[in-house]
Amino acid sequence: MLCVLAGAAYGVFRTEAALSSQWRAEAVSGVPLTVEVTDMPRSDGRRVQFAAKAVDSGGRTFDLLLSDYKRREWAVGSRWRITARVHPVVGELNLRGLNREAWALSNGVGGVGTVGADRVLLHGGSGWGIAVWRSRISRNWRQADADGGLSDGIGLMRALSVGEQSALRPGLWQAFRPLGLTHLVSISGLHVTMVAVLFAWLAKRLLACSPRLPARPRAWVLAAGCAGALFYALLAGFSVPTQRSVLMLAAFAWAWRRGRLSAWATWWQALAAVLLFDPLAVLGVGTWLSFGLVAALIWACAGRLYEGKRQTAVRGQWAASVLSLVLLGYLFASLPLVSPLVNAVSIPWFSWVLTPLALLGSVVPFAPLQQAGAFLAEYTLRFLVWLADVSPEFAVAAAPLPLLVLAVCAALLLLLPRGLGLRPWAVLLLAGFVSYRPEAVPENEAAVTVWDAGQGLSVLVRTANRHLLFDTGTVAAAQTGIVPSLNAAGVRRLDKLVLSHHDSDHDGGFQAVGKIPNGGIYAGQPEFYEGARHCAEQRWQWDGVDFEFLRPSERKNIDDNGKSCVLRVVAGGAALLVTGDLDTKGEESLVGKYGGNLYSQVLVLGHHGSNTSSSGVFLNAVSPEYAVASSGYANAYKHPTEAVQNRVRAHGIKLLRTDLSGALQFGLGRGGVKAQRLRVYKFYWQKKPFE
């Protein structure tokens, strides 16, 4: 008990230390900073993003992730005097998806910011150092593809050698996810372990050729493996995940230095070493997956002394697949059905062919060698992209905690020897986990979820048997939050997908959401989407709930915002109104055309709470109880604006904001409207929800 209390106290102490080094103030513009670029900048086409050690005017130091939308050059090691808009790391909060606060805390990111127009160079950067070396390697890889014919292959080589994930275009990441291969292109424990094994194997071969063996050959082999792991981790930028991987391997090597040791004892020692070095590792999904899968391998393979290597490999792949069924299903709400088979082939190919070629081409920048590696990488990616297009995914709804615990137990039972007779029960429990469905919405009622889409919009409307999604949010929001949350909500089919208008914060996630089967696409600008129909005035009813597309009177010279679809949903007398980015002129046109029929208890404010929408006349006509502003935390547009907030409150309307509360839920029915946050709890280190 004393050890447990000491460990808990140590974890709290380290967490408080990490929190104290984060930017705690709200968004502040024009902050004078002296920054040193500490890692290779990465570009996504819109901006250049780089990690920097920043010192403010008070002498306080922060590790910031800065963005420059002017896309200027920021040499590694250079120091600058800049002004920036800085704010804490606060991400979206949905049913499932990336937790940016946990990611920032576990990776040592103290805040994010946007660089201003002016900058003064204080120091041009040194010509040596790991970061500079990595930058040169990346440049050498780019120069190896003079004609640009192997751009994707070169990008993969850069990702595998120096950890430059931004070298891969976004479309490739979307291909890796349904195949369950994202872990292969972001340097992690798998890569570091494979390089360690490669170095250890080379050391063993060299020692075998030596006329005189050292006193402790095992120690030399283990030391070579650890040295290889450290070398690769440094080459990849020595990020926090790679640091943990090196430490884990060092712990394994230390445990094995004197001969055979219990696999479980080694596992526990490695886990203790990682948590002692960095207690915040528990916030990273990778830690749970890494140690969980290794534990599954030990559980399945330990004690089977008489099996051949092939049988052991098959059993190991089976164990990893079974436990992944539970872990991936719960964490990501999705199961790539072809993942076990694809991983069985891809892991050896990436580990023993592509990664060694990437390392060799980095150390020996010989153009033909680099081009050969890039050629293999290019056609590997082309095959995987094709495979991703034809590979299905299985959505897994968010199961309650007791069912999750039972599913983990079932996975372990399934890995036990056949003679125990427990496998049929394990299969039944796992089937219950993957087929779980949340409680259905009652007839004549509607459940509305306004997802936390950052500076975007996405609204899910559910009835007893139907689902409608209004807008998809941005590309990033859809991939990291909305699609996983739709899966977790049990949405396997969208009966209607509505795209209010052609704007990246409303339809940017169309490609990601579009992979979910749908019964039809309706849009304010249907010409931009294949097979889409216009959201002209029409009414329909699902499960006793009335839906209606409203349309302003015809106007001339309407911009894209003015073409937004307008949706009204009525269930048992309670109503929801969503207007996309409709401006005040469009709102006034709706008032003139529909008058009091616009009355709705829940109004999603137009244009995220911009001054261009939510006029007083419109608020009077709608007369809502709740007004929802779907906007990003500390967004550059300051949505919802002070003017809109004051106008809403002056009408006696309760304002709810996704940037402060995360995703919001509303129940519409005969009892009126029930409103609540989707996530009502938070850990003590979390900022969001603020309210």
From Swiss-Prot:
Disulfide bridge partners, by residue number: none
Membrane topology: Multi-pass membrane protein
Subcellular location: Cell inner membrane
InterPro entries, sorted: ComA-like_MBL, ComEC_N, Competence_ComEC/Rec2, Competence_DNA_uptake, Metallo-B-lactamas, RibonucZ/Hydroxyglut_hydro
NCBIfam families from the UniProt entry: ComEC_N-term, ComEC_Rec2
General function of this protein: Essential for natural transformation. Could be a transporter involved in DNA uptake.
Transmembrane intervals: 183-203, 220-240, 280-300, 322-342, 347-367, 396-416
Family membership: To B.subtilis ComEC, H.influenzae REC2, and E.coli YcaI.
A Pfam short name: Competence
The protein's name: Competence protein ComA
Principal location: membrane
Superkingdom of the organism of origin: Bacteria
Annotated keywords: Cell inner membrane, Cell membrane, Competence, Membrane, Transmembrane, Transmembrane helix, Transport
GO BP term, example: establishment of competence for transformation
Signal peptide range: none
